Curated annotation (Swiss-Prot):
Metal-binding listed as a keyword: no
Annotated gene: rplQ
PROSITE patterns: RIBOSOMAL_L17
Gene3D superfamilies (alphabetical): Ribosomal protein L17
Protein name in the entry: Large ribosomal subunit protein bL17
NCBIfam families, A to Z: L17
Pfam (any one): Ribosomal_L17
Family, similarity comment: Belongs to the bacterial ribosomal protein bL17 family.
Length: 123
């Protein structure tokens, strides 16, 4: 029996967890860098990598599928036009996590999640 497969529940109910991840992924795609606890960033990384992989093929179907998760049209357009073209030759590993150490208040492991390559400057 395979155990411990799946995802981290982050001590939240499913709707709260989904909203948290959705907001963090949108912030990550907007700013191309995000700082939070290591556990949250592992989950954000999983979603962001899937979204970038899906956005590498710019079709109407893929745009509609990703718009179910990303409701901001500006971020969706940025993902398809600026972020995903940079990673066309890369088959995965679009993000990197840099560990920052422990947070002062509760000793939670902190980290930064950022894109491996800088997005295109489209005018």
């Amino acid at each position: 029996m395979k155990t411990k497969l799946g995802f981290n529940r982050l001590s939240r109910k499913s709707s709260h967890r989904r909203a948290l991840l959705k907001n963090m992924v949108i912030s990550f795609l907007k700013h191309e860098k995000i700082s939070s606890t290591k556990a949250k960033l592992f989950e954000v990384k999983r979603f962001a990598e899937r979204l970038i992989t899906r956005a590498k093929v710019d079709t109407v179907h893929n745009r509609r599928e990703l718009s179910k998760f990303i409701h901001d049209k500006y971020i969706l357009n940025k993902l398809f036009t600026k972020i995903s073209p940079v990673f066309r030759q890369r088959s995965g590993g679009y993000t990197r996590m840099i560990k920052l150490g422990k947070r002062y208040g509760d000793a939670a492991e902190m980290a930064i999640l950022e894109l491996v390559e800088k997005p295109l400057k489209v005018e």
